[in-house]
């Protein structure tokens, strides 16, 4: 967010849609009730949402049996619920869980030994991009090589549909986090600076993300352009840290030391 805002004043939110998912935005310190700094109420402060942990109590998000299995088999069961349903680290595994279920029910790869399919995290999210982006024989050949099975054309088309559904749900969930910030802050336009492999490399993520945002924020269907759009923020963490360091040094020179630990 800070890295992008340095060059783009229309930046309203910074987001990561990659191995994990998260977002940050600027809030007035007067709205942060537990904060006591002596700063003017309108002073802006960056808020790190950490919404990858949203609904760890499992009371809101409708989880499938595949989501539940991934959570229970993870190193930290019951944590990062939202992230496990939408982030790049898990989308490929959700796809694998679905296909493994189909195999166990005798729906795909009939009569074949599919031990590779049973390997956890054997399929990464990047392969879902391949399935969606390449409708031809090359993608099917790669699928066969990955799982060491023969894939019929019907099975290949099914796998493409599953990949599409998993990736679409992930993109729409990612939209929910950003749209919640927009609604809370009354944001009607601006740029969401996004970094991460899913945002930058999945061929259909941005389109699906934008469609969902329009639905949630009730944009008119006949709009000429989207009021809120994704912009690229590659290496935002590194550049942003440098910008924040420079800003902090300037604050110290100006005698503003709230929130700065004295050494």
Language-model regions, residue ranges each:
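Conserved A3 ("GATE") glycine/threonine-rich loop of ANL adenylate-forming enzymes
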Residues: 1, 17-22, 42, 49-56, ...
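Conserved phosphate-binding catalytic cores of ATP/NTP-utilizing and phosphoryl-transfer enzymes
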Residues: 1-14, 24, 29-35
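ATP-binding/phosphotransfer module of carbohydrate and carboxylate kinases, centering on a glycine-rich
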Residues: 4-8, 65-263
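Short glycine-aspartate micro-motif
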Residues: 12-16, 22, 35, 46-48, ...
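Conserved beta-strand elements of beta-rich interaction domains across eukaryotes
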Residues: 20-22, 28-30, 54, 198-199
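Short conserved micro-motifs at the rims of enzyme active sites and ligand-binding pockets
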Residues: 27, 60-61, 204-205
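E2/UBC-UEV (E2-variant) core
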Residues: 38-80
